[in-house]
A protein has these predicted regions:
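Hydrophobic alpha-helix-in-membranes signature
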Residues: 64, 75-78, 163, 187
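Conserved SAM-binding loop of SAM-dependent methyltransferases across substrates and taxa
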Residues: 73-86
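Class I SAM-dependent transferase core
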Residues: 1-67, 97-114, 219-225, 229
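Short capping/connector residues at structural and topological boundaries
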Residues: 41-44, 50-51, 83, 126, ...
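Conserved beta-strand/loop positions that form the S-adenosyl-L-methionine
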Residues: 69-71
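S-adenosylmethionine
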Residues: 87-229
Length: 229
């Protein structure tokens, strides 16, 4: 694991590397009965889950408290917490089996200032103030902006880890939310020594904390992104 991380320009101190390895062992042990990830092959798990999650921390200063919306089995939140232990983190995931796994991982790894939110994140039910939102290829940008609007305030950052084909939804978000949000970053990048292209998209909240629109209550399909190439 260390070699793959180093090749990808990810350097972790020995205690953090040990925690990430223990998390990997737990993920592997619990995957079959908890439906945590479709990735099985070791290098794919390291690159597409751990490197993909940790690399964003090299590109942006992570806001705190930070909510990871649709975290699934803990991506990107748990690797980010391991690599950047000072952040306060909320792992938002509605599927009970995955929430059980997340709570076990938090306890077994001794992660502090981390908690789970085991319901759908919608604007009227998730109102805990946060300085940042992060989400990894869960849903269109507009839906995340809507359903986290009850928790973000002026200056809060909403960080999207996307694939390269995000232009249409990005244009829609900029057009529809110009009063409440400003696009402050749109950065294409690739995971080092791979063909995996990514886009880092960041919006900043312009208006005080309040529900932007009732349509935030619409159903969306929270999912993880282990099949992203």
């Amino acid at each position: 694991m260390r070699e793959l991380l180093t090749r990808s320009k990810i350097e972790l101190a020995p205690p953090a590397l040990d925690k990430l390895w223990r998390f990997h062992q737990l993920l592997r042990e619990r995957n079959e009965d908890r439906d945590l990830t479709r990735l099985i092959e070791f290098e794919s798990v390291v690159i597409k889950h751990y490197v993909d999650s940790l690399y964003v921390g090299k590109l942006v200063k992570l806001p705190s408290p930070l909510v990871d919306v649709g975290t699934g089995a803990g991506f990107p939140g748990i690797p980010l917490k391991i690599g950047y232990p000072d952040i306060e983190l909320i792992l938002a995931e509605q599927r009970p089996r995955r929430v059980m796994f997340l709570n076990d991982a938090i306890r077994l790894l001794g992660l502090r200032n981390v908690k789970t939110f085991d319901h759908r994140v919608v604007s009227r039910s998730f109102t805990e103030p946060v300085r940042g939102v992060i989400t990894r290829a869960v849903e269109p940008i507009t839906k995340t902006l809507l359903r986290t609007s009850g928790a973000t305030d002026i200056g809060s950052q909403i960080i999207f880890m996307k694939g390269p084909g995000v232009d249409e939804e990005l244009r829609e978000a900029v057009r529809d939310f110009k009063r409440d949000y400003k696009l402050i970053r749109d950065q294409p990048y690739s995971l080092p020594h791979t063909t995996h292209d990514r886009r880092l998209v960041i919006f900043e909240r312009l208006t005080p904390r309040s529900v932007v629109a009732e349509s935030a209550e619409e159903e969306t399909g929270d999912d993880d992104t282990e099949d992203q190439a």
